[in-house]
Amino acid sequence: MAVDSKIVVSCTSRLFTDEVCKLQEKVGCIVPLRDSHGSQNLQTVGLKPALGIDLGSDYVLMCNYLSTCTLAILEEVTTDSLVLTKISRNGTYQIKNKYHPFFQWDSNIQVCVMPPLFDQESNSVDLQSNNFTLLLPIVVPCEVAHEALQKVLTYNIYLRVTQAEPNAARMADVLAQTNYVTYLGNHYSLNLEGMESLGALAFLDNLATYLCIMVGLLPRACVRLLTTLLRHGENELLNVFRRMIPDEFNAAAANLNADTVYPDMTKIGLLITYLQTLGSIFNLSPRLQVSTYTPENLSATCWYVC
């Protein structure tokens, strides 16, 4: 183990024997850290720093935290410390598939580090000796994370709408269609009703803001481009999308001259920036590339992707 990748987390009090045993069951699991330096305390470990003092279920806030925190692998547990290996972009690592619920991994797939959407209790360790609860993320195949995010957002969008207009939709029907993820023929419950909505609401605020700005930033030259591409044998989809443009957009794009070049260039630059921002929201980071997976001992060799 390289010296600069080793992180020692000191406990305030000695761990009880049963706590050591529970933590040893998590050896090989991914652990988020608030800081990156080599000596830390328990208050910087796990998902608790993302939530403050109260351990709620704000999974969107946890997602944001996981995309910026330091990730490490739990290697060793003693009565007064945890030893971890920090994950960097240029290393290869051994991790274990010890998460709840269990999702089958395979060689040559990408897995995603995400909040414990399915079962928070089974992915946490209560350390009464230190008055601390270690809440860990789960690591699942990326398609699982994609579907989970899709359904969390859909549920929260409908929840927000029905809070303003109670008759807009039946939340029981919405919940029935969004409260699970299907993988390899199995259904896994998401427990959406128990989710805190503040983080999701802030997430939706950002999403709506960026989408509105992007519409406003659409350069008039881009709108004109759709009409100038009109030709014999064009792609049929192009004509379909052309009819979707509002008339006022076409009117605004009617006149192109030297005075419109700089504003359009500025808009394109801003449009690229907001597209990148939206991409950062939905890129399911952080991700790991699994090169080999051994089902017998649940061990995987992987490296950090993003």
UniProtKB/Swiss-Prot annotation:
InterPro entries cross-referenced by the UniProt entry: Herpes_capsid_2
Gene Ontology molecular function terms on file: structural molecule activity
GO CC annotation: host cell nucleus; viral capsid
Compartments, record wording: Virion; Host nucleus
Secretion signal span: none
Pfam families: Herpes_V23
UniProt entry keywords in alphabetical sequence: Capsid protein, Host nucleus, Virion
Main location: virion
Function, as annotated: Structural component of the T=16 icosahedral capsid. The capsid is composed of pentamers and hexamers of major capsid protein/MCP, which are linked together by heterotrimers called triplexes. These triplexes are formed by a single molecule of triplex protein 1/TRX1 and two copies of triplex protein 2/TRX2. Additionally, TRX1 is required for efficient transport of TRX2 to the nucleus, which is the site of capsid assembly.
Complex formation: Interacts with TRX1 and major capisd protein/MCP.
Family: Belongs to the herpesviridae TRX2 protein family.
Name this polypeptide is given: Triplex capsid protein 2
Organism encoding this protein: Alcelaphine herpesvirus 1 (strain C500)
Organism phylogeny: Viruses, Duplodnaviria, Heunggongvirae, Peploviricota, Herviviricetes
Gene name tied to this protein: TRX2
